[in-house]
Structures are given as C-alpha cells and as structure tokens.
C-alpha cells in the first residue's frame, strides 16, 4: 500500500492521503513513533459515510489530496454498493486518485476483488495473499498513465526479485482457470455462516455472523468472549480468528468439523458466563 501512496503523490504532486479501513503497516503512519510531518498528511476516515471525505476535501483543499485509499470493512461490506461509487465520483471531481486495498478481497470476494464485485474501477489497486496462496507476494497495478510515473518514483523491495512467490502465483492462476474457486469460497462461507448462526440460535447466545460468506466475521458481545472462544477452539484443534475465511482446500467435512468445535467452544464460553 505504501508504494501506491508514494506513486499517487508522485503522479498528482500532492501530499495528503485519506485512508479508510485496515492497510496493515500504513495504518501506523498516523500513530506513535511517526514524525508529526508524516502524521499530518494521513487522515483515517470511517467506512460507509461519504460526508467526512467531502469535509476533508473542503478543509484540506482539492489541490492537496493525492488519493483516497480504501480497504473494505468486512462486517458491513455491502455498504460498498453505494459508498464506493460515491468515492469514485468524489475523487474524479477533485482530481485525486482512488486506491483499493484488495489484499483480502482479491481472488476471494471475486477474482477481481471488490472492484469486480462492486463494479467500481479504482486508479490503483494492491493484490496479495490469495494470488499466491499465502506465499509472500504482492502486486500493485493501475491506470497506464499513473503506472508510468513509476519511472520517476523510487519504489524498492528487499525481496522484490524473489521468484518463489511468482511460481506460487503461476500455480494459483492455473487453478483459478481450471476450477470454480470463487463459487466454492462463497459456498463454504455460506455453510459456515448458516452453521454458526444455527448454533448460536440453539444455544440462545448473543453470537452472530456479519459480512459476506467469503469474508465473514463472528460477532461476540465482548473482547473477553472473543479471546475465550478463540482459545477454546484452539484447544480443540481449530484456529479461529475474528474473521472466518474459508479457503479452496477446505472440504465440507472440514467445515463440519469446524462447526462441531465452535459448538463445543461456545458451550464452554457460555459456562464461563461470558455470553450472558
């Protein structure tokens, strides 16, 4: 993501970046240990509400904002149907670039990520993770005129010449050509969503699923309950995180096993009084 931000600044000649969502290390650009000069040009704004972005353009001035950089909020991702086209229009009106963080959504929500699912084309995008089945690799891409600015912008990587990730990506692309990966991810995710929802209903606990099936998220009443659930699942052989992402290698039997473990884990958390 940092590469696209530098490229956007080089292309537009502007300094400020409006960010939305989780960009990994880039989120820390506005945090502790970062010089105020850098903090001052990153502005984190909420998902799904255009008003703060409009206000930022008014306050900072159109000539000062290089880009709006967006990662979808997975719990309420469907707001993207209205929010992302509105951001596309806003950035075009002000001459800023629109950047999509497709590190999670790419090759998962749709093969082309959020831009394909929501039918909104950004100026720049970043893909990783799914494109190489977890082997370290990332790629930034975009409009030809913007990408040509790479010649004038210093972007380097210690492992940029490594070929293992490229070989992994080549193998992954071949599987995407042969197999119906995306539909499988949606089907496995739906099975998880429906299963967890049914378990919570049967146990009468305040636990639910948010987001879309390929990028689902378990909602619990407290952070303590979440940590407890993850620990109970881990003890039973299932690694669970706040997000519940199926992958193509998971079978129906794997999903059933995970649901059985989640059922037992929720019962244990309930006995501890964390789901009252």
Positions of PLM-derived features:
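PLP-dependent enzyme catalytic core of the Aspartate aminotransferase-like
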Residues: 177-179, 235-276
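A short glycine-threonine-serine/GTX helix/turn-capping micro-motif
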Residues: 152-161, 177
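Structural signature of PLP-dependent enzymes
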Residues: 172-197
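Active-site core of PLP-dependent enzymes with the aminotransferase class I/II
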Residues: 55, 72-94
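PLP-dependent aspartate aminotransferase-fold enzymes
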Residues: 1-67, 88
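Helix C-cap/helix->beta junction micro-motif
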Residues: 93-94, 203, 236
């Amino acid at each position: 993501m940092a590469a696209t931000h530098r490229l956007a600044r080089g292309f537009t000649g502007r300094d400020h970046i409006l960010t939305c969502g989780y960009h990994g290390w880039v989120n820390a650009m506005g945090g502790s240990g970062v010089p105020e000069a850098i903090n001052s040009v990153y502005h984190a704004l909420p998902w799904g509400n255009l008003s703060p972005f409009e206000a930022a353009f008014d306050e900072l001035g159109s000539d000062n904002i290089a880009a709006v950089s967006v990662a979808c909020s997975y719990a309420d991702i469907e707001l993207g149907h209205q929010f992302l086209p509105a951001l596309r229009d806003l950035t075009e009106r002000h001459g800023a670039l629109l950047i999509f963080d497709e590190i999670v959504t790419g090759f998962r929500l749709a093969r082309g990520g959020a831009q394909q699912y929501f039918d909104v084309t950004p100026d720049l995008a970043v893909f990783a993770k799914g494109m190489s089945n977890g082997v370290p690799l990332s790629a930034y891409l975009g409009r030809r005129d913007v990408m040509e600015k790479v010649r004038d912008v210093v972007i380097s990587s210690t492992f940029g010449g490594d070929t293992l990730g490229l070989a992994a990506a080549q193998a992954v692309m071949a599987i995407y050509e042969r197999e119906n990966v995306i539909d499988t991810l949606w089907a496995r995710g739906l099975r998880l969503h429906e299963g967890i929802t049914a378990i919570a209903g049967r146990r009468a606990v305040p636990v639910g699923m948010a987001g879309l099936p390929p990028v689902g998220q378990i909602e619990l009443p407290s952070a303590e309950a979440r940590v407890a659930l993850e620990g109970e699942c881990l003890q039973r052989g299932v690694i669970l995180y706040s997000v519940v992402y199926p992958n193509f290698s998971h079978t129906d039997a794997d999903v059933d096993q995970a649901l059985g473990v989640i059922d037992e884990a929720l019962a244990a958390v309930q006995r501890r009084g964390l789901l009252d």
